[in-house]
């Protein structure tokens, strides 16, 4: 009873010691949820980057835009309810500035402009990429009779839109195989936009028999399913929290908000799908011939 009384008195003393509540202290410092312009310190730090890097070197942008075949004037993908799942239109403000605003690191600004280059591109003869339709790229290789698809983006809606762009410009051909490079969701989550579960080849067959069956082999590195679970289930929450701080994912796109995430504009928020592989690559350098392509 005595201990309880002492604790109560201690708490009363804490409330009456003259210190302000945390929210009041933040308000005095100007720490509110409203977007603010760059401080002088931030503006000077960002401006100094122009002296550190050669911004006249446009090679990265030339690489990002070379081989463009087609791109819609605007790109914004929505679900049936009108919810935006992926948007390049949200970054149209990039065209309003000749150089980075003082609120943005110039290197990040250039990276964002590079990632804003979206559409269907020819990489080389017979190899094409859809870029800027999700965090990753969707690549197709032309075989004798159809497409070999490398990586299927994060969301079904995005991969469907990517395949439609390919079909519009290059013709409609069957998918002969899907190859997933690794276990990050932005490389496999859109697989249901490329093929169905019923399309998948029988994993009990040899890869040669799978290819001959008329079904679609799903080819991955060994351990793909295990690592997909470990990374996206076990570590997913921690990775998500880290990326919120790292990239400002919850911010609105803008010069005082969210910009690119290095390898892409960010992750789409559509339907994520998954298929187990029908064939796993177990050794580096293993060679397969798929639809006439080695």
Identify the function of each model-found stretch.
Residues 113-173:
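Conserved beta-strand hairpin/beta-sheet module of binuclear metal-dependent hydrolase folds
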Residues 15-17:
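Bacterial signal peptide processing site
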Residues 122, 212-215, 219, 223-294:
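Metallo-beta-lactamase
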Residues 1-2:
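Bacterial N-terminal signal peptides that target proteins for export
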Residues 19-112, 116:
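N-terminal pre-domain segments of enzymes
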Residues 10-13:
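C-terminal motif of bacterial Sec signal peptides marking the signal peptidase cleavage site
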Residues 152-153, 183, 223:
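Active-site metal-binding loops of divalent metal-dependent hydrolases
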Residues 145-146, 156-217:
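Active-site metal-binding motif and surrounding structural segment of the metallo-beta-lactamase
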């Amino acid at each position: 009873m005595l201990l309880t009384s002492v604790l109560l008195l201690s708490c009363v003393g804490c409330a009456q010691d003259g210190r302000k509540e945390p929210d009041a202290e933040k308000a005095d410092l100007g720490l509110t949820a409203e977007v603010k312009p760059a401080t002088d310190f931030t503006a000077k730090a960002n401006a100094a980057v122009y002296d550190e890097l050669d911004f006249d070197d446009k090679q990265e942008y030339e690489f990002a835009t070379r081989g463009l075949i087609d791109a819609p004037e605007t790109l914004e993908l929505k679900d049936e309810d009108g919810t935006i799942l992926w948007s390049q239109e949200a970054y149209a403000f990039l065209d309003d500035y000749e150089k980075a605003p003082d609120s943005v690191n110039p290197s990040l600004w250039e990276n964002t402009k590079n990632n804003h280059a979206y559409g269907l591109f020819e990489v080389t003869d017979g190899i094409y990429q859809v870029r800027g339709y999700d965090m990753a790229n969707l690549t197709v290789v032309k075989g004798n009779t159809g497409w070999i698809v490398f990586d299927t983006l994060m969301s079904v809606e995005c991969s469907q839109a990517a395949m439609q762009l390919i079909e519009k410009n290059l013709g409609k051909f069957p998918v002969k195989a899907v190859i997933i490079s690794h276990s990050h969701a932005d490389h496999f989550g859109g697989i249901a936009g490329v093929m169905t579960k019923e399309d998948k080849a029988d994993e009990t067959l040899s890869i040669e028999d799978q290819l001959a069956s008329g079904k679609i082999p799903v080819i991955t590195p060994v351990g793909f399913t295990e690592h997909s679970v470990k990374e996206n289930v076990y570590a997913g929450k921690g990775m998500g929290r880290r990326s919120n701080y790292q990239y400002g994912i919850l911010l609105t796109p803008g010069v005082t908000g969210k910009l690119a995430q290095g390898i892409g504009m960010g992750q789409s928020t559509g339907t994520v799908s998954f298929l187990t592989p029908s064939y796993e690559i177990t050794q580096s350098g293993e060679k397969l011939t798929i639809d006439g392509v080695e």
